[in-house]
């Protein structure tokens, strides 16, 4: 991610004072801001005036290495922050990544550009509902399945 001097993102009061946002750790807030800074938008004219529409939402990403570079935190802090953002409903993973070199995990930020669309904003329901089941789990270890110890066996030689 490159730093830019383009305009920033303003949080609405409903987001800023929500239970979901106030219970985030500082590292989680930093990761959320990094993902929001990755978003690109275009202005669309409507009856109510100009509105922002994010064009690459669902395609934003931040790797552990980038997070460590920007914040000075460790890998486990990145994972805890990402998991907390998913649990609280601020982001949703759209692509797992990691299958080959250059394949990154991609996320969708669930905060509307103008603070108008409330239908997709999961964080509004946070205290009553969480999305812990959406947190990606490590895949089961399948290598060496046949050579592992069976029930009743031991490696002890008599």
What are these model-derived regions, one by one?
Residues 8-9, 19, 76, 105, ...:
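Intrinsically disordered, low-complexity segments enriched in small/polar residues
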Residues 35-38, 85, 147:
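A broadly tuned preference for mixed-charge, low-complexity surface segments
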Residues 41-108, 112-113:
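Winged helix-turn-helix DNA-binding recognition segment
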């Amino acid at each position: 991610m490159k730093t830019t001097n383009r305009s920033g993102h303003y949080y609405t009061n409903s987001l800023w004072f929500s239970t979901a946002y106030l219970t985030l750790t500082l590292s989680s807030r930093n990761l959320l801001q990094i993902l929001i800074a990755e978003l690109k938008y275009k202005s669309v004219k409507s009856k109510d005036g100009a509105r922002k529409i994010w064009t690459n939402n669902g395609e934003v990403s931040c790797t552990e290495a980038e997070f460590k570079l920007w914040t000075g935190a460790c890998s486990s802090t990145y994972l805890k922050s990402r998991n907390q953002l998913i649990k609280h409903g601020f982001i949703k993973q759209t692509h797992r990544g990691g299958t080959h070199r250059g394949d990154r995990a991609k996320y969708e930020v669930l905060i509307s550009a103008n603070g108008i669309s409330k239908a997709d904003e999961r964080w509004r329901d946070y205290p009553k509902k969480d999305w812990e089941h959406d947190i990606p789990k490590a895949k089961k270890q399948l290598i060496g399945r046949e050579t592992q110890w069976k029930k009743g066996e031991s490696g002890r030689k008599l």
